[in-house]
Amino acid sequence: QMCIRDRNYGCVIKNILVPTKKGPVDVVVGHDTLADYENDFNSQSSTCCGAFVGRYANRIENAVFSVGGRAYHLEANNGKNHLHGTFPRKIYEVKSFGDTLLLEAESPDGEDGFPGNLKISVRYILTEDNALRMDYRVSSDADTVLNLTNHTYFNLDGEGDVLNQKLKLYASRYLEGNNETCP
């Protein structure tokens, strides 16, 4: 049976222990201590390693966007652009354990410069066939932009480099970025 370990700081997936013939292997690349995660997430060159990322995963060009004809100005934290937001630095309340881990938090109107009060619910669900499902639910009391992701990094061997590992994505479309990797 697969096992997942999480931190309520940043909703981080810290470990995924996968059963193998040689025993469990941790396939997650992460940090050892909470202080390491805090240092990473507060750094200008943060990897957001293992974290739940938002309010807007990816970059917002020139740190400005419009909703309903109104311009919203964000912190330029990645050159002249805005990257990811502060969800990785939030403390999430753990609501349930077991095969389903439920974590919740709120994001007040104006946090990071975004409109709307958000209620955030993140579920990490471990299925009977050793699959991990991530279910995000967010409600807002105002029109806003939202783009969520999880920033877990994997090494399927559990250690060493990943240069011989292959990833295949079955996607009919993808979003290209400009020279600053902004959509």
What label would you give each PLM region?
Residues 159-183:
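Active-site/ligand-binding surface loops and adjacent short beta/alpha elements
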Residues 7-67:
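Acidic-aromatic substrate-binding/catalytic surfaces of carbohydrate-active enzymes
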Residues 11, 115-119, 126-133, 145-147, ...:
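Coil-to-beta-strand transition motifs
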Residues 70-71, 75-129:
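Extended, loop-rich substrate-binding clefts of extracytoplasmic carbohydrate-active enzymes
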Residues 6, 124, 132-140:
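Short, well-ordered beta-strand segments enriched in hydrophobic/aromatic residues
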Residues 2-4:
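Short, small-residue-biased leader/transition segments that mark boundaries at the very start
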Residues 24, 135-164:
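Acidic (Asp/Glu-rich), glycine- and aromatic
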Residues 108, 136-143, 169-175:
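Short, solvent-exposed aromatic-acidic interface loops
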